[in-house]
Regions:
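Bacterial lipoprotein signal-peptidase II cleavage site
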Residues: 17-32
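Ligand-binding cleft/hinge of the Venus flytrap
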Residues: 76-85, 163-192, 222-227
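Flexible hinge/capping segments at coil-to-helix
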Residues: 138-159, 174
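Periplasmic-binding protein-like
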Residues: 131-138, 215, 219-263, 279-286
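A ligand-binding cleft/hinge motif common to bilobed small-molecule-binding domains
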Residues: 113-121, 167-170, 201-240
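Hydrophobic/proline-rich hinge and linker segments of small-molecule sensing/allosteric domains
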Residues: 50-54, 125-146, 247-250
């Protein structure tokens, strides 16, 4: 079922224009101008790339052995190995990611981040690497009821996320959107969650009726054999298409270094191998 949903997602995106996702809050990420020290030289000097993340499968999460794994985790490890530096992962509050980047607490945001025009103005963004859209997640036993009407129900999304931006109207819709999330949920009660994983937990516990999360997150965390086997993914409503990218400080010369490294990892088959491991091969942007 998940594979079918993923294939349908890619099919829709291949024939439509892609729009940005996610709201950008906080200060502009500090720039690296031609007259200042190279960001790459700064990272080489300290010997590591500090990556800002939040925890959600299949991008960055801890497995049963308490080891940090995931598609973005393994890609960052492969890229930094090719660049000859170490990698360090740091958990951040998603709503303050730009501040963490500009203050140099982290060197990049590599965590299923949607590309938007606003973010491209404030940060240096890598080439897109994965397709994404928004998915409604709810209890299986209540799917028919909820899809009939969300009036008076509680909907949740990660604070600062695409889902929240779609619900509050701060994220513009593209031509593929038939009904905006803002209109769809106008008669529902909105409550923000600290992360997409916590949004799913709210639905599982019954505190919320619906979670609006990235489809990549939903496909990786919901269904048989997961902690959310009693939940179901519904993408009947198209709230727009997005692409994931990696964010660096504005003007950073590290962006192109990473783009080139990823290109080489595509050529030697590493990207396909990692994507297959996490069931994301159908969503790769090649």
């Amino acid at each position: 079922m998940k594979k079918i949903i993923a294939m349908l997602l890619v099919l829709v995106m291949s024939v439509t224009g892609l729009a940005g996702c996610g709201s950008s809050k906080g200060n502009e990420a500090g720039s690296t101008s031609a007259g200042s020290d190279s960001d790459w030289a700064y990272i080489q000097d300290k010997g590591k790339l500090t990556v800002g993340i939040t925890l959600f499968a299949p991008m960055n999460y801890y497995n049963e052995k308490n080891k940090l794994v995931g598609f973005d985790t393994e890609m960052a490890e492969a890229v930094t190995k090719k660049l000859g530096i170490d990698v360090e992962f740091t958990e951040i509050n998603w709503d303050s990611k730009e501040v963490e980047l500009s203050s140099k607490n982290i060197d990049c945001i590599w965590n299923g981040m949607c590309i938007t025009e606003e973010r491209k103005q404030n940060m240096s963004i890598s080439d897109p690497y994965l397709y994404n859209t928004q998915a409604m997640v709810m209890k299986k036993s209540r799917e028919k009821e909820i899809m009939k009407s969300v009036k008076g129900l509680t909907v949740t999304a990660e604070q600062g996320s695409t889902g929240e931006g779609k619900i509050d109207g701060s994220i513009a819709d593209d031509d593929t959107v038939k009904v905006s999330a803002q209109d769809y949920f106008k008669d529902a009660n909105y409550v923000a969650s600290d992360s997409m994983a916590k949004a799913l937990m709210e639905v599982k516990s019954g505190t919320a009726d619906v979670a609006l999360v990235d489809s990549v997150c939903a496909l990786g965390m919901v269904g048989e054999g997961t902690d959310y086997s009693d939940l179901v993914i519904n993408m009947d409503n198209n709230f727009g298409q997005q692409e994931y990218g990696i964010a660096f400080r504005k003007g950073s010369d590290v962006t192109e270094k990473v783009n080139e490294a990823i290109k080489e990892l595509y050529e030697d088959g590493t990207v396909d191998t990692i994507a297959k491991k996490y069931g994301l091969q159908e969503m790769l942007i090649k």
